Amino acid sequence: MDKNKLFFIETWGCQMNAEDSEKLAGMLKEMKYEATDNREDADLIIFNTCCVRENAELKVYGNLGTLKKLKDKKPNLIITVCGCMMQQRDMAEHIKKRFPFVDIVMGTHNTQMFPQYLKKVENERTSVVEIWDKEEGIVEGMPIYRSYDMKAFVTIMYGCNNFCTYCIVPYVRGRERSRKPEDIENEIKELVKKGYKEITLLGQNVNSYGKSLDEEMNFALLLRRLNNIEGLLRIRFMTSHPKDLTDDVIAAIADCDKVCEHIHLPVQSGSTTILNKMNRNYTREDYINLVNKIKSGIKNVAITTDIIVGFPGETEEDFEDTLSLVKEVEYDSAFTFLYSIREGTPAAKYENQIPDEVKHKRFNKLLEAVNLISEKKNKEYEGKIVEILVEGKSKNDGSKLMGRTRTGKLVNFEGLESSIGKLINVKITKAQAFSLVGEEV
């Protein structure tokens, strides 16, 4: 009997990309391919790319360059490049010109076509370059090979309508399209039947959910509906745009026992001047008022964020506004980024681009403040008993288990492997900068 062919997928970028890779893997499983962790062994290599920052693109170029030798050694190796980076104007042609050994290039709107492209390459030994300019309707029921066996990503909507001036996402992911609530509910019910305990609802802006549907539906109503699914233990979600986070959503999080008390609420800047230039549609004051509303409405809530340093025209005063906002809000954690020029976005043409050395100086100052606050917030957990969903063995210490609190804190602790996949209580004995240490009680 012929040995099954092996595939290897490398994914850059956000959780949406991670779920797209799970769908690619699901289609390949149906084509009798098996997954491998080793590029050298693979008959098919897929790079699922990101273009939110230049650094992500440089990683793709570097990794593609290393595949040339492998392709020379294994002429039948099929190399595929897909995802957001490919959806950019002229990028597919650039990739084929620079890396002619790539066999399949496709974008974000035609993932479901991948089996056909692969068969064409296998049968005809030709290459396929297929980028769809416009998003089609949502394709339901695609096979999916999940990365975990107790927690799963479930996309509730695709695309983005916000057009922040620094961001490439609306250009490569298309306009907002919401899935029908019954399709989302049925997918989660099937996952629960298979033993899944935690679901993370995904969307570029989950608070816009339902706007493209014919029926009366919004994100708050969806949370309440999904909270009734029997056997599901936890519901998480990301990402929330501050301008669309309503009182109804705050109330739903507070009321629904399965919805975790954690909101990822990207602020991007603490300066109203910069927020206007970014087209974020809220002011510093709006954001702080929203945070106060969240904190008073949801007990023990954790708030995390994204911050961009060095946006064009950012003055020292603008940066200090960001720093003071971080100290006022006291985020549980923050993803901090240096502004990266993205061709095709309005901000790429803005004057007063900030010199790299100034960006780095501000970035380091911000990071120091963020980390100090994270550690302080973690220390508040010392001595407390918290509910953990046990996810598996600790990545740093195989003799320990790891899991997360409802607020998303990573906890390492000694325990029995039979606890994996269960909710247990753990007493926090020590707080570290990025994680907690505990013992089962």
Curated annotation (Swiss-Prot):
Locate the residues binding [4Fe-4S] cluster 1: 14, 50, 84
**Which EC number(s) does the record attach to this protein?**
2.8.4.3
Record localization: Cytoplasm
Give a GO cellular-component term: cytosol
Q: Which positions in this protein are listed as binding [4Fe-4S] cluster 2?
A: 160, 164, 167
Gene Ontology MF terms:
4 iron, 4 sulfur cluster binding; metal ion binding; N6-isopentenyladenosine methylthiotransferase activity
Q: Which InterPro entries match?
A: Elp3/MiaA/NifB-like_rSAM, Methylthiotransferase, Methylthiotransferase_CS, Methylthiotransferase_N, Methylthiotransferase_N_sf, MiaB_methiolase, rSAM, rSAM_horseshoe
Matching entries from Gene3D superfamilies are given as: Methylthiotransferase, N-terminal domain, tm_1862 like domain
Q: Where is the MTTase N-terminal domain?
A: 5-123
- Name the cofactor(s): [4Fe-4S] cluster
Outline the extent of the TRAM domain.
379-441
Cofactor details (free text): Binds 2 [4Fe-4S] clusters. One cluster is coordinated with 3 cysteines and an exchangeable S-adenosyl-L-methionine.
Q: Which residues form the Radical SAM core domain?
A: 146-376
Q: Which UniProt keywords apply?
A: 4Fe-4S, Cytoplasm, Iron, Iron-sulfur, Metal-binding, S-adenosyl-L-methionine, Transferase, tRNA processing
Q: What class of enzyme is it?
A: transferase
Reactions catalysed: N(6)-dimethylallyladenosine(37) in tRNA + (sulfur carrier)-SH + AH2 + 2 S-adenosyl-L-methionine = 2-methylsulfanyl-N(6)-dimethylallyladenosine(37) in tRNA + (sulfur carrier)-H + 5'-deoxyadenosine + L-methionine + A + S-adenosyl-L-homocysteine + 2 H(+)
Q: What is its main location?
A: cytoplasm
Q: Main role?
A: Catalyzes the methylthiolation of N6-(dimethylallyl)adenosine (i(6)A), leading to the formation of 2-methylthio-N6-(dimethylallyl)adenosine (ms(2)i(6)A) at position 37 in tRNAs that read codons beginning with uridine.
Q: How does it assemble?
A: Monomer.
Q: Which PANTHER family match?
A: CDK5 REGULATORY SUBUNIT-ASSOCIATED PROTEIN 1, MITOCHONDRIAL TRNA METHYLTHIOTRANSFERASE CDK5RAP1
In the record, the note on similarity to other proteins reads: Belongs to the methylthiotransferase family. MiaB subfamily.
Put simply, this protein is called: tRNA-2-methylthio-N(6)-dimethylallyladenosine synthase
